[in-house]
């Protein structure tokens, strides 16, 4: 299999990421609910990665638009919505796909539920809106509102045999994910994206996606900034798919040599094989300048065992680069 980096990537996020989290499995449930357990901030969630999309050809990749990929499906729009002022008032079967949503409200996604008629928006410049005085971390109020979002999703027939991911670009605060009534996983850290591998939960054609979102979670103690305290799905929701053997993540390091004339380009690419057998993979990258001209390229072959990830690295000097200062 040959992977061309320029066919796969359309955007890159550079920066530092500090993680202090526990990635748990839904098969090993804690005694406390996830949203009350300070030791759990993610369940069955994919490790964070750079932002990019998978495309079927180079031309579509170069547009830089996710919607140009046949392996991308945006889920923004009108969803069904059920709201309660306290989690204690939530029906036990609320995530059952068989229950009717005829009496549920409509809600726009993305969009905070407080500005769409559900609950109360709170502004404070410091302190915790749910416990203004004498907070006792990780204790949360019993009157913790919950919003349940639901919609149908359609899995294309040509995605069969591929890895299928659900991407939540931002949802606040504690998010449980269900597909066809089965728990997929959980996420906090509401200003960062969350991804879930959903292959074993979906079938070709119609499926029911449900998100159960708690307004406050133990993660809320790390989200105390000077802004409106509002809740719900705040950014895009989408599905995408990749081959079983695919590019999982990449890192770019760019600097100058000691003369400050030549550029030093370093690329690290993580290739993951979710197939049942080892696979021979060839990675090809292209680096383009502002005019679309290829200024660097490279190719390497490697073997990735089933269920494993392997990093492929490239180093190249770019003579007489156009430098800039900030």
List the predicted regions and their residue ranges.
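Short, hydrophobic beta-strand segments
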Residues: 198-200, 313-326
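Beta-strand-rich binding/interaction modules
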Residues: 179, 262-303, 310-314
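Bacterial N-terminal signal peptides
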Residues: 10-21
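N-terminal pre-domain segments of enzymes
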Residues: 27-74, 78-80, 87
């Amino acid at each position: 299999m040959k992977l061309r980096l320029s066919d796969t990537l359309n955007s890159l996020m550079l920066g530092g990421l500090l993680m202090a989290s526990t990635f748990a499995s839904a098969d090993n449930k804690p005694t406390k609910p996830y949203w009350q357990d300070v030791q759990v901030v993610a369940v069955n969630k994919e490790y964070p990665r750079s932002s990019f999309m998978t495309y079927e050809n180079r031309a579509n990749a170069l547009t830089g638009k996710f919607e140009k990929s046949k392996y991308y499906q945006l889920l923004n729009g009108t969803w069904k919505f059920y709201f309660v002022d306290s989690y204690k008032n939530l029906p036990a079967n609320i995530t059952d796909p068989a229950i009717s949503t005829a009496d549920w409200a409509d809600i726009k996604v993305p969009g905070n539920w407080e500005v769409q008629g559900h609950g109360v928006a709170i502004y404070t410049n410091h302190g915790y809106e749910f416990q203004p005085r004498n907070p006792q971390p990780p204790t949360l109020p019993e009157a913790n509102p919950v919003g349940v979002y639901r919609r149908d999703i359609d899995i294309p027939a040509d995605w069969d045999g591929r890895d299928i991911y659900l991407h939540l670009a931002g949802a606040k605060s504690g998010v449980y994910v269900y597909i066809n009534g089965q728990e997929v996983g959980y996420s906090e850290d509401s200003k960062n994206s969350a991804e879930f591998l959903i292959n074993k939960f979906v079938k070709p054609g119609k499926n029911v996606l449900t998100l159960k979102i708690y307004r406050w979670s133990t993660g809320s103690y790390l989200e105390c900034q000077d802004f409106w305290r509002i809740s719900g799905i705040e950014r895009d929701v989408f599905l995408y798919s990749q081959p079983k053997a695919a590019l999982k993540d990449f890192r770019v390091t760019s600097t100058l040599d000691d003369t400050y004339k030549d550029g030093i380009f370093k690329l690290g690419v993580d290739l993951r094989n979710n197939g049942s057998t080892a696979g021979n993979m060839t990675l090809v990258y292209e680096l383009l300048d502002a005019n679309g001209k290829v200024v660097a390229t490279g190719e390497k072959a490697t073997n990735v065992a089933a269920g494993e990830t392997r990093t492929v690295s490239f180093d190249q000097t770019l003579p007489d680069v156009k430098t800039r200062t900030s």
